[in-house]
């Protein structure tokens, strides 16, 4: 089966969950015996994207003459030329994100990551484009059952064209972090030696609810005393970062809030391993990859009780209303104060995380493409 995977390789810089999904599926499609893969991208400019693109071995590679964002903008205005002009004949064009890509004969598969986010936060023009993308797709790949429900509620004509293909955690998150990696974590983060910390892994976006997370954790006596740090892995726009810095400053001079940006992948594994817990009060999640990564590394998870997170965390989570600072504080307080229950849920979390491996997700993707030819 001839499959063309279309994605923007410049997104390799500070990869979000969507990009991690795209690259993980791409790399496994390249090894799938039933797939003849071509990888197609717009002009690659960022050094991180160029490094990935040049190192990609196995599949045929096609780089278009315009940046991905520019050619997608052109295709929105005029669905021509078809992507087969560059790729040659294809059975499927697979988009790991919500892209509109015109084809000559190939069927189109697009991935839906977070319909509710689009409905709640995107402007009307983008929502109209999403409807067009779903209306013209032959197959829609949905990353969670919650997202599928939202998709079919908003776009009922998609019924019969949706397949479940979840996100996952990379295999190395299921392996213990090396002792030397763990030993360097606090020094690399700029934390005092031996200090425990709560962890957040999320882009600095309003829907991730990080300012409320800071205010809620600042109510913990250990945090205000400087005996428990809070580490926010992520990055974002200057305005959102300013809001978070101001919220952290309001917690008092002894509180320790650390915002180190995005570390390399193996360093992130060690950061998870050393954390006391992951706190993830996101207002809107179509999946929630950090919850799986944390459970795979054997740390407890305090999760929002809404959108897809209860589906992903199952019985392993300490759940809270993400709009209520008192509820977030209480969930973390309970997690900290119940060592026996914490150990029980950590064991549950490891078992739950095993369901979310990329080889399983890739098998579901390949089967969906085969079933919908």
Residue ranges and their predicted role:
Residues 1-373:
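Carbohydrate transferase catalytic cores enriched for Leloir-type hexosyltransferases
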